[in-house]
């Protein structure tokens, strides 16, 4: 093989909106409310190997806005990307898929969610940047704790 074939390779093959739903269970009455909504945001990342060097990474976001105890809107969206990743050492592959890929996808997700919110008739809500490295490290720590707990428990049961 030539040196070019052994070079680390990272390519975005496709970025796409995989799924999106919007619910407004209390409209049109909710538009008459004067109070500012409270907004809750949840983000998750999943990755799947599609082929030897091809990965699908999905960043999911759920935004729930409530006025008092009434849901103004609920948006769920999944922004996905297909990435071709070759000649990357195994110890660098997981962070690349868990940090770099979601960082690339998140602006698309944020834009799609913001667009859906304004098209639904609500004032714009801009999602803050997310530190995917911190999320990745937090997820790793949780996995290590779970593995340590399972290793110390008899018959594979977790200790309380």
Swiss-Prot record:
InterPro entries (alphabetical): SecB (IPR003708), SecB-like_sf (IPR035958)
Compartment(s) of residence: Cytoplasm
Superkingdom of the source species: Bacteria
Q: Which GO terms describe its cellular component?
A: cytoplasm
Instruction: Give the GO biological process terms.
Output: protein folding; protein tetramerization; protein transport
Q: What is its main location?
A: cytoplasm
Q: Name one GO molecular function term.
A: unfolded protein binding
Q: Does the keyword Ribonucleoprotein apply?
A: no
Identify the keywords attached in UniProt to this record, alphabetized.
Answer: Chaperone, Cytoplasm, Protein transport, Translocation, Transport
Q: What does this protein do?
A: One of the proteins required for the normal export of preproteins out of the cell cytoplasm. It is a molecular chaperone that binds to a subset of precursor proteins, maintaining them in a translocation-competent state. It also specifically binds to its receptor SecA.
Q: How does it assemble?
A: Homotetramer, a dimer of dimers. One homotetramer interacts with 1 SecA dimer.
Q: Which family does the UniProt entry place this protein in?
A: Belongs to the SecB family.
> What name is this protein filed under?
Protein-export protein SecB
| Name of the coding gene | secB
